Amino acid sequence: LGNIDTLTSQSSLFTFQKYINEKGDSLNYRQLLSDYDNNSKYPLVIFLHGAGERGNDNEAQLKWGVKNFTSDNIMKIHPSIVLAPQCPKNMSWGNFSEDDMSLLPSPTKPMQLLIELVKKTINTMPVDVNRVYITGLSMGGIGTFDAISRYPDLFAAAVPVCGGGDVTKANIIAKIPIWVFHGVRDTTLSAKLSQNMINALIKEGAEPGFTLYPEVGHFSWIAAYSDPMMMEWLYRQHK
């Protein structure tokens, strides 16, 4: 029971929010704030959930990964602003061809709204614009590659977990610090998708991090988000 209580109290640290733009389009999200004062600037972390957590309850997106940002260690040593948006059912973060992972011309509606929300947050909260980070798992890992490929100037670092991306966009994202995680035994999204991105990035002169878990299937996010080295690395990155 103690564990369930802990998880519930971790969730309650995320306030319920809704972004609505001028057209009336909306995106549900949860927001985590460490203790902060307006005289300081704080890193902004965007977390993109996977396909199973889509919906409109503004709750399911906290199921995996993002609650690790509520640990005392992170909140005290690396106070930050964390946004965890929820993608509606039957939509996705990334817009790409299923055949070859090539990026399609326009972002999805949820991605468009997310970028609007990020820009609004930067304008209205004490965000360090040189420390905007994005991470996500599965559908959110693909979304992470999608976001940095479309908006490379926005992000200081990215951590795509069991995702994949468009190898032809490697030149656009080569200067962004990236650490990729994947399970070798993943049958939902092949680890080759991550490997292909890593190879393409290295060809462009980048030095991405790549952690492959030999015995892990699709759930590589459990290990990735509880890796203190990954967290320390993420918060060290800045433009």
Q: Model-predicted segments: where are they?
A:
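Alpha-helical scaffolding within the catalytic cores
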Residues: K63-N73, C162-N171, K192, N196
